[in-house]
Every structure is written in structure tokens, then in C-alpha cells.
């Protein structure tokens, strides 16, 4: 009674429709090593212990005590009678390293006794789900900071132990200053060197030219389109069957590196990374030369694309030392503040000696203004195409009708334009409407003049079309002559004895398709104007200035709010004192 059950596609990896790593077991029904049978039974058994935990990352500054309701889901042969649940909070084994001239050396693995423990009230449990078993209360003052703990809950059922475990990361944001820092701020140092923190590419370049230590936080919207977003959850099925711009297959972290000395992590990450890598782009480090950097946090791209990327790396730029990240370390989360503090502590130390050498020109290949069309005030003459000007590859436009498709992009003022960036639709496995042949014209001296014509290769990658020469204009006419999915002709999928094939539409050969043939299609996710170098630099500086002004306004508002809160607290204390008197 009351059992709802569940359904799995398969227990092992599926071998049809491309490689689909959806199974608990591999294609040969062997363990992948991801989970043991005992771990599987913790959440998939006739009796399961459950804990309602709001977050695996806990900020002690905001939570003096944590309450965790415990529940029992039981569908055994008979109800449970007089069962007592035991719990304990255990510190996970700490791996201690020493760092010297010859790198890191494993010192020891330290196992700690339980930090807290207790027992819940004895109860009976029916054949039902989500039955309340009581509540665990954790006093945060008894728990050491910047550590990962395991909450272990167990009970004895019919002679066997039923148990479940959950990881908990404990931080304290009040002890992790600064949480947010303005561009170019100087992090105080105990050594002769200070660390400068910035998200301003020009300021970063200046500081590096001066030989400084720089933490460069590259904003999402300033990152090259060659650098796709990463994802905490793995890709579903595979990117051949269900392509997306963001793909993920886990992470590799150099967890023994001193940059993580006060930020607990395993080599394959953990739940404390989930919010850190949401809305984050993976930096394509093959553009820099993978041997030139030390890749501290590497997201694993899905194997059909297999980009070599990084979320955090260190290198030398001339005589300067650079730590570069695309992770938003300024977000309001205790794990972000803890990671930032751990990185800064390392950067201030003598251990911060990056080995690889990278030029600023190489680093610049990671930068691109995503919303350049918004910055320019660009408009398109067909409202149905406006989404391709939003700079977001995860939206797209789709036109049907017949080739060629032409549209005009216009800006309020004239600009020196050097080319166009076209990014195809990212989520269609048949590359529907992907541009092949094109014609680009500029409005010059009162007439349309050709500035480029050619063909593109079929790819999900951004395609940058350079003009024959820079043009000074306020209007560009873009014409799609044909696409890869149907080069100039309608097509359809047909079943043949040995499989499915995409064929050019021939109504005489397939009369049943008359009146049902698909129309010629053009699609795009992003179309951006590429500016000449001086124009692009001016736009960069304008947006950075606007960002700093916005940050300053936010700081003023936050300071005012803090002051108001202090005044309210003071008023309440005064009122309480008057009442007491």
C-alpha cells in the first residue's frame, strides 16, 4: 500500500543511439566504481532513512543551530515496532600535506572521532513513506570551520543495520573577509607581496605589466564564445542525440594543491561546487597551450566535443604571477567566500610560484563582448529575428519559407566593422538550418556593396566571418543563401532496408509526401557585429566603467542598509532599557 515505485531505463549503459552512459553498471554489467551496493541500499531499499537538509553548505554566521528533520520510508513485509534511530556527526578523514621546494608531500591521513552524536525517540513505523522520526539539532559552536563532515544516521531492522549518510560543509562567512571586493582592490598580505583582485581586463593587463600578483575574475558576459558554459549535472544520453551549448561530465580538481588548503574538496569535486559552477564558462585553455598553465579546476567536457577547459588556473605573465578564474567568487555563498580566501592565502604566500609562461595576447583570446549588439543599440528589420541579437547562444531564431533569407542590421551611429560572428543553433542534432553559404553587404555611399561572400564549415562552434576590409557604416545586410540541413532544397527522412537516410525531396518518387514537404529553414542563435580594434576597445572601456559605477551604487545601498539595521538595533535596545526601567 502507498508505494509509488520508480522506473529505470536500464541498469547498464545503453548501446543504441550512440553511447548513452545512463546506467549504474557499464555495458558489460560490471560496476563503474561510482557506487557500491551498500551505498546504493542507503537510498534504494525496502527501508530508507531520509533527512531534510536545506543545503549541504552551512554558514555558521547565519545558523547558530541547525535542525535536520529525519524521516523513515518503509515498505517491508511488516510494520516496524519500537525502533530507535542513532545519529552522529563525523569529520571526514583529513589528508594533510607539507609543501616544500620539491612540491607537495603526503604527510598523513588523520581520522577524527565523532564530533556530535545522539539518539532519537523510540517509535513504530507503518508501511508508508516520509514518516516523521524526530529532529537532529547541531550546535554550530561545537564544529570546526572549513571542514567537511558526514551526518550518519542508522537503525537496526530485523537484525540488520539500515543507514544513510550525507556530507555537510561548514563555513563562517563572517570570518571570510572580504566577501566582495571592487576592481583593483588590494588584498592585505603578511608577506612583502600584495595580491590585486580585478575583473577589469585593462587593469589586469596594467598590473601584470608591473609584475604584480593578480587574481583575475573573468565575468561570464566578457568570455569568448569559444568558451561554453559548464554544468554540474552530466549530459543526458549524449550530445549527438541531445546537443546543448553547456555540457558536463564532472570535474578534475588538484585538491592537494595549496590553493585549496582551507577549502575542503576531493579530486572529483562535491556538492559544495554546485553553486560555484552554475552560470560559469569553461575557459578553453588549449588556446593558451595546456603545458603553459597549471589547471587547478578542470571541467570535463562531453566526449563528442572534448574541449580542454579550466575554471581556475595559474601561470606567469612576464615577471607577474596570475591566478585566473571564471568562477564568480563574489556571489553571496559561504563556499564562494571560503574558496576565495583559500586562494588569496595561497597567492600571498611564498608557495605561489607558477611555472608556465603565457602572454597577454594569448589570454586576450578568452575575452569577447557577448552583448555587443545591446551596447551598440543594434536593431534588425525583422522582429522575428530579434532573439539572435541578444548575445545568448541558448536562444535561437528559425525562419521557414525559401532561400535566400535577407535581413538588415542597423545601428544608431556608424561604426568601423571588421566582420560578423555567426553562431548556429546549439540544440538541434540534425543541425537544422545551419548556415552554409552567405553574402554580406554594407551600406556605403548610398548603395549596397559586397564586403564578403563564402561558405562555412558545419559546426556548433562560433564562426567569425572577416570582411575583405573594415567598413565604416551603420547598416549591414546579411543574406543566407543556403544551409547544411537542406542546401537549397527541401529534404526529409526516409526509411530504407538498412536504416534511415536524409534525402532531397522528390514528390514523384514519394507521392505520399506531396503537400507535407518541409520548407527551407534558416536558424541562428547569435549574430554579432565584429568591431575594428579601436572601436572594440572603446566599447570595452565603456561597459567596464558602467559596471564599476553600478558596483559603487550597490556598495552605497548596502552600506546604507547596514547603517539602518544598526540604528534599528540601537533603537530596540533603548526601548527595551526604558521598559526595564
Regions found by a protein language model. Give the residues of each.
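Catalytic beta-strand/loop cores that center a nucleophilic Ser/Cys/Thr
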Residues: 223-224, 237-335, 351-357, 366-368, ...
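Disordered, acidic Ser/Thr/Pro-rich linker "stalks" and the adjacent N-terminal cap
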Residues: 361-417, 425-438, 444-447, 453-461, ...
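Intrinsically disordered, low-complexity Pro/Gly/Ser/Thr-rich segments with frequent PxxP/GP/PP motifs
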Residues: 95-144
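Short beta-strand-plus-loop segments that form exposed binding edges in beta-rich domains
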Residues: 479-486
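Substrate-binding clefts and catalytic carboxylate motifs of secreted carbohydrate-active enzymes
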Residues: 1-91, 95-102
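Short alpha-beta junction capping motif
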Residues: 190-238, 319, 343-346, 581
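Short glycine/proline/serine/threonine-rich loop/turn segments at secondary-structure transition edges
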Residues: 78-81, 142-150, 334
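Short beta-strand elements
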Residues: 160-178
Amino acid at each position: 500500500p502507498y508505494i509509488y515505485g520508480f522506473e529505470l531505463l536500464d541498469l547498464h549503459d545503453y548501446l543504441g543511439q550512440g553511447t548513452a552512459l545512463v546506467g549504474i553498471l557499464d555495458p558489460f554489467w560490471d560496476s563503474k566504481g561510482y557506487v557500491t551496493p551498500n551505498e546504493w541500499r542507503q537510498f534504494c531499499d525496502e527501508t530508507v532513512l531520509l533527512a531534510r537538509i536545506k543545503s549541504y553548505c552551512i554558514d555558521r554566521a547565519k545558523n547558530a543551530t541547525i535542525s535536520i528533520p529525519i524521516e523513515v520510508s518503509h515498505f517491508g513485509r511488516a510494520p516496524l515496532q519500537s525502533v530507535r534511530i542513532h545519529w552522529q556527526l563525523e569529520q571526514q578523514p583529513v589528508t594533510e600535506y607539507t609543501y616544500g621546494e620539491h612540491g607537495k608531500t603526503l604527510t598523513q591521513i588523520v581520522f577524527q572521532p565523532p564530533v556530535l552524536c545522539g539518539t532519537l525517540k523510540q517509535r513504530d513505523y507503518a508501511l508508508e513513506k516520509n514518516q516523521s522520526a524526530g529532529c537532529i539539532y547541531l550546535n554550530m559552536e561545537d564544529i570546526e570551520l572549513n571542514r567537511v563532515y558526514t551526518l550518519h544516521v542508522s537503525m537496526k531492522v530485523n537484525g540488520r543495520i539500515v543507514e544513510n549518510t550525507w556530507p555537510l560543509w561548514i563555513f563562517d562567512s563572517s570570518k571570510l573577509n572580504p566577501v566582495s571586493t571592487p576592481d583593483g582592490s588590494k588584498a592585505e598580505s603578511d608577506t612583502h607581496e600584495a595580491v590585486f583582485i580585478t575583473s577589469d581586463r585593462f587593469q589586469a593587463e596594467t598590473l601584470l605589466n608591473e609584475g604584480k600578483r593578480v587574481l583575475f575574475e573573468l565575468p561570464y558576459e566578457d568570455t569568448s564564445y569559444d568558451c561554453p558554459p559548464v554544468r554540474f549535472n552530466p549530459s543526458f544520453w549524449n550530445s549527438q542525440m541531445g546537443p546543448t551549448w553547456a555540457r558536463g561530465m564532472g570535474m578534475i580538481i588538484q585538491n592537494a594543491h595549496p590553493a585549496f588548503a582551507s577549502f575542503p574538496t576531493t579530486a572529483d569535486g562535491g556538492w559544495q561546487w554546485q553553486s560555484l559552477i552554475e552560470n560559469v564558462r569553461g575557459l578553453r585553455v588549449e588556446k593558451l597551450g595546456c603545458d603553459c598553465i597549471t589547471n587547478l579546476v578542470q571541467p570535463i567536457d562531453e566526449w563528442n566535443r572534448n574541449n580542454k577547459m579550466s575554471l581556475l588556473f595559474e601561470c606567469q605573465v612576464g615577471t607577474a604571477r596570475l591566478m585566473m578564474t571564471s568562477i564568480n567568487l563574489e556571489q553571496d555563498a559561504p563556499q564562494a567566500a571560503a574558496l576565495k580566501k583559500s586562494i588569496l592565502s595561497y597567492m600571498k604566500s611564498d608557495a605561489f610560484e607558477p611555472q608556465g609562461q603565457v602572454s597577454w595576447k594569448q589570454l586576450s583570446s578568452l575575452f569577447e563582448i557577448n552583448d555587443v549588439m545591446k551596447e551598440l543599440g543594434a536593431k534588425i528589420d525583422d522582429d522575428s529575428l530579434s532573439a539572435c541579437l541578444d548575445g545568448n547562444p541558448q536562444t535561437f531564431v528559425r525562419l521557414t519559407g525559401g532561400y535566400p533569407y535577407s535581413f538588415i542590421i542597423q545601428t544608431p551611429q556608424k561604426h568601423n566593422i571588421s566582420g560578423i560572428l555567426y553562431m548556429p543553433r546549439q540544440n538541434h542534432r540534425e543541425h537544422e538550418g545551419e548556415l552554409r553559404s552567405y553574402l554580406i553587404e554594407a551600406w556605403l555611399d548610398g548603395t549596397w556593396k559586397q564586403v564578403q561572400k563564402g561558405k562555412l564549415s558545419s559546426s556548433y562552434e562560433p564562426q567569425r566571418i572577416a570582411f575583405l576590409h573594415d567598413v565604416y557604416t551603420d547598416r549591414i545586410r546579411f543574406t543566407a543563401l543556403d544551409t547544411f540541413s537542406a542546401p537549397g532544397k527541401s529534404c526529409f527522412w526516409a526509411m530504407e532496408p538498412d536504416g534511415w537516410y536524409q534525402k532531397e525531396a522528390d514528390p514523384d518518387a514519394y507521392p505520399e509526401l506531396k503537400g507535407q514537404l518541409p520548407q527551407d529553414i534558416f536558424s541562428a542563435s547569435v549574430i554579432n557585429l565584429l568591431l575594428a580594434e579601436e572601436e572594440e576597445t572603446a566599447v570595452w572601456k565603456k561597459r567596464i566603467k558602467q559596471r564599476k559605477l553600478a558596483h559603487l551604487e550597490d556598495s552605497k545601498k548596502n552600506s546604507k542598509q547596514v547603517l539602518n539595521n544598526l540604528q534599528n538595533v540601537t533603537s530596540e535596545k533603548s526601548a527595551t532599557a526604558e521598559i526595564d526601567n
